[in-house]
């Protein structure tokens, strides 16, 4: 089924000094008209209530960038071995209480779900601010934090699920990029 609220935009060019994903996201952002803009990954699965709940949470928390940590779908043997360890390492490096603290902040965001207030996204320069960063999610968190706006990260509790890598080769290259 096609949703009339979704437009598929094709882009066949990317400036040399840009990461491809950032370039594509920037193009999409130029077409966004609402007060909030959401960037997500194609391998995520949303609960029907996720976006509504996320916008309500961002407003309630006065967050200009709200990111959600997905519930990882683990089906392959290598995921069973590595995903729990890798996730634990990420949470040790970026403790949730520090991410969401107003005083001892450690900026972090998860690229699987980046919900921006459109005004903050525009104020920081949008994807131009992170155009060549392979970890644009963390870069965005730092830029938003440095601008004085608030970044918040929440756990998905099953509302956002992700099966990150379809093969062992993509699994290896994906985690190498992160670490």
Name each model-derived stretch.
Residues 1-15:
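Acidic donor-binding segment of Leloir-type glycosyltransferases
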Residues 11, 40-42:
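Catalytic metal- and UDP-sugar-binding loop of GT-A-like glycosyltransferases, i.e.
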Residues 14-23, 133-134:
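A short, glycine-/small-residue-rich helix N-cap motif at loop->alpha-helix starts
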Residues 25, 37:
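Short aromatic/hydrophobic "clamp" motif used to bind/position activated sugar donors
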Residues 33-35, 110-124:
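Conserved nucleotide-sugar donor-binding
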Residues 42-57:
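Acidic donor-binding/catalytic loop of UDP-sugar-dependent glycosyltransferases
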Residues 58, 65-91, 119-122, 127-179:
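Catalytic donor/gating beta->alpha subdomain of glycosyltransferases that bind UDP-sugars
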Residues 72-74, 95-115, 156-163:
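A recurrent flexible, glycine/aromatic-enriched loop bordering the glycosyltransferase active site
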């Amino acid at each position: 089924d096609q949703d009339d609220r979704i437009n598929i935009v094709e882009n066949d060019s990317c400036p040399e000094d840009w990461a491809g994903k950032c370039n594509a996201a920037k193009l999409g952002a130029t077409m966004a008209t609402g007060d909030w803009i959401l960037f997500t990954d194609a391998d995520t699965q949303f609960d029907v209530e996720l976006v509504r709940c996320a916008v309500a949470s961002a407003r309630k928390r006065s967050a200009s960038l709200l990111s959600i940590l997905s519930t990882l779908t683990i089906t392959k043997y290598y995921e069973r071995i590595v995903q729990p360890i890798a996730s634990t390492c990420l949470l040790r490096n970026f403790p949730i209480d520090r991410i969401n603290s107003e005083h001892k902040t450690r900026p972090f965001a998860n690229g699987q779900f980046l919900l921006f207030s459109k005004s903050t996204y525009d104020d920081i320069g949008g994807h131009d601010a992170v155009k060549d960063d392979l970890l644009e999610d963390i870069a965005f968190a730092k830029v938003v934090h440095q601008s004085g706006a608030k970044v918040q990260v929440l756990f998905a509790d099953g509302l956002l699920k992700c099966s990150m890598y379809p093969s062992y080769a993509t699994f290896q290259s994906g985690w190498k990029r992160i670490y």
